[in-house]
From Swiss-Prot:
Compositional bias ranges of the Polar residues kind: 407-416
Name of protein: Uncharacterized protein TC_0561
Region (Disordered): 396-420
Family membership noted in the UniProt record: Belongs to the chlamydial CPn_0065/CT_288/TC_0561 family.
Length: 558
């Protein structure tokens, strides 16, 4: 995984610039390294010689002060020049190495292994996020000083190339914005496919490869974006070399003059050493100041533009700008089409996912209510059985003890009843039952199985059943007489019917939405082919740009 390092150098093509007038040490690094080692050896020998001369002079030896002063001057000048030059080169090399180390893997085989490893989590958003953060640090802009140089290089064609440069910068900003929005746009599809989304994972892997290649190759293929205006033209570089040598000779002459006119003594020798070192540093800093002024002068910029026109010419830079625009345009259009398709299909996926969640919740509610309803029905059956047994066992004791109160009870029931017609029918039924029992007793019939409820024992007699119901609550009476359910069971049944209706409605809606969601998922998968083509095109154009950059640098070095 590629991690973005805080405080790393500016991630821009100017980190790997087109060096228009490279020095001898830049063109021949091995020879320059050998010369630096030689200079360090000479400085060491001169220091040893200086110490030896001072020791010999203190011992009485006759040594010309001019020799001591010359050695001290050379020592100070060389040591200061080597120290500052080495520090500058080391800093530039460190910046480039630090940025190169933070880039994705270089070789194709390792890069394929990096992309096809199975150590990804989820849909590979973490790896892609790190790469997008690093990709967004690419600086594809041209600073004002470089714009002035490009005006000199392209002349009348600058307006056209400037429009291309601005279009490249705008395309890059839009690509960066689309990359940051992708994870939010795919929330709906990830909810639709709640587990590992293989097509989305493949798309993210392809996009990981695209961003990785661009991070690795685009800074080294900057073209017009890698031109630095703060460099010297050939004429200015020659002038700077003459001034630097003159300053060095002036330092040596100044130290030699001091040696000639100052009396010989040990304190004077020490002062000469310090003076030579100070003059060497001052000369080197003065040379750097002269270089800074020369780099930013209008004359140097015009001469630099002439050097570019004479060597690589504006055609190579124009071609590189064209390929860069083609690269970013193709990638931007691919990502834009993907974003439009994903955003268009996102409501369908979200609605489908919400319906699935709703159906799941309703199914759980239905199962819970159904279990409660079945339990309530069983409780009602038990209660009904208990009430029937209670009415059966109400017995004749109530009848024998309360015979004298039957008429009063009947009258009281007739008075309290809200339905007089029902009470009248009930009284007639009771009277008819009494007459049937009397006839049965007079006839002495042994068929007790017939009309068993009306048998002489009066068990479960209608009037006794009615008396038993007086001791029941209204709900118990409903269960016993009307064979109804309890209030709790009725409420549970109503809730169950309501949930069943909602569940059936949601299932019908999901069935209607399923085809739309499958079509949207198929359209989303088609964008993977577009990303694959964009990956091939990106790699092809980056290779072309890299070759053009190498060609431009080769022509500049000739």
């Amino acid at each position: 995984m590629v991690y973005f390092k805080a405080g790393q150098p500016e991630h821009t093509p100017r980190t790997f610039p087109l060096q228009i007038n490279r020095s001898f040490s830049d063109k021949h690094p091995k020879v320059a390294k050998a010369l630096r080692i030689t200079a360090i050896v000479l400085v060491s020998l001169s220091l040893i010689a200086l110490v030896g001369c001072i020791a010999a002079l203190s011992g009485g030896a006759v040594i010309p002060l001019a020799a001591i002063g010359g050695i001290a001057a050379v020592t100070g000048l060389l040591s200061s020049a080597i120290a500052i030059y080495s520090a500058k080169k080391a800093l530039a090399h460190k910046k480039q190495k630090q940025l190169a180390d933070s880039l994705p893997l270089d070789t194709g085989t390792e890069h394929v292994q990096y992309l096809t490893t199975n150590n990804f989590r989820g849909n590979n958003w973490d790896t892609l996020e790190k790469l997008v953060q690093q990709f967004s640090q690419l600086d594809l802009t041209v600073h004002p000083s470089e714009k002035e140089l490009l005006k000199e290089v392209f002349g009348t064609e600058y307006k056209s190339i400037n429009q291309t440069i601005e279009s490249i910068s705008n395309r890059f900003a839009k690509i960066r914005s689309l990359l940051y929005q992708r994870e939010q746009l795919y929330k709906g599809e990830e909810r639709y496919n709640r587990y590992l989304n293989t097509p989305l994972l493949r798309k993210n892997r392809i996009l990981t490869q695209i961003t990785s290649n661009m991070i690795r190759l685009l800074p080294r293929s900057g073209g017009v974006f890698s031109i630095k205006a703060n460099t010297l033209s050939r004429t200015s570089h020659t002038l700077y070399t003459i001034l630097k040598v003159s300053l060095s000779l002036g330092v040596i002459a100044a130290v030699a003059s001091l040696v000639i006119f100052l009396p010989p003594s040990l304190p004077i020798i020490a002062a000469l050493g310090l003076a030579s070192l100070s003059l060497g540093i001052a000369a080197f800093l003065m040379a750097r100041g002269i270089r800074y002024l020369l780099e930013r002068s209008s004359i140097n910029r015009k001469q630099l533009a002439e050097d570019i026109q004479k060597t690589i010419g504006p055609d190579v830079l124009n071609s590189m700008a064209y390929y860069q625009h083609q690269l970013l345009s193709h990638l931007h259009e691919t990502l834009l089409d993907e974003a439009i398709t994903t955003k268009w299909n996102q409501p369908i996926f979200l609605e489908h996912a919400d319906l699935e969640l709703k159906i799941g919740d309703l199914t759980k509610q239905y199962d819970i209510l159904n279990s409660a309803f079945e339990q309530a029905l069983r409780n009602d059956e038990l209660l009904r059985a208990q009430l029937e047994k209670r009415a059966y066992r109400f017995g004749s004791s109530i009848t024998d003890n309360d015979t004298d109160n039957d008429s009063g009870a009947t009258e009281s029931q007739q008075t309290d009843s809200e339905n007089d017609g029902f009470q009248e029918i009930l009284n007639k039924g009771i009277e008819a039952a009494k007459q049937r029992r009397e006839k049965a007793n007079q006839s002495g019939s042994n068929k007790e199985d017939m009309f068993s409820i009306w048998k002489p024992s009066k068990h479960l007699a209608l009037e006794d059943l009615w008396r038993a119901s007086e001791a029941c609550t209204e709900e118990q009476l409903s269960i016993l007489v009307d064979n109804c359910m309890s209030y709790k069971t009725l409420e549970c049944q109503a809730a169950l019917q309501k949930v069943r209706l909602q569940l059936q409605t949601a299932q019908r809606s999901l069935a209607a939405l399923e085809n739309r969601a499958e079509n949207a998922y198929y359209e989303s998968n088609l964008s993977m082919m577009d990303l694959a083509r964009a990956n091939q095109e990106t790699y092809r154009l980056l290779n072309i740009l890299s070759e053009l950059q190498q060609l431009a640098q080769y022509v500049l070095d000739r």
